[in-house]
């Protein structure tokens, strides 16, 4: 058996990432988060991340503020919004941190 050369994976820090906002229509509280853009499909990537938040809240019973808000107000009361598309993981983390400090979202605390 011959060893095949391994394909190099694309570095994750070179991908596009999203900074997104989840807003509860009931009380106006919101959450700022990030996720990577999968195959250039921004909305699909945000939907994938939203489903992960729902699993954490509804299936796994997580106790973070976002999960508690999802259980309290129902998933239908939340809207999703893409705020920025950023090239690179670190740049996206930096922007997320800045927005959280600036906007003080209740569900991130």
Language-model features: locations:
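Structure-specific nucleic-acid interaction/processing domains
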Residues: 2-109
């Amino acid at each position: 058996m011959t060893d095949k050369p391994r394909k190099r994976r694309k570095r994750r820090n070179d991908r596009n990432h999203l900074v997104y906002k989840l807003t509860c229509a009931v009380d106006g509280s919101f959450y700022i988060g990030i996720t990577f853009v999968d195959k250039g499909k921004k909305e699909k990537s945000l939907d994938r991340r939203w489903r992960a938040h729902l699993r954490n809240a509804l299936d796994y019973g997580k106790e973070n503020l976002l999960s508690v808000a999802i259980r309290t107000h129902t998933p239908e009361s939340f809207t999703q919004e893409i705020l920025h598309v950023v090239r690179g993981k670190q740049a996206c983390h930096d922007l997320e941190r800045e927005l959280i400090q600036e906007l003080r979202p209740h569900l991130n605390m």
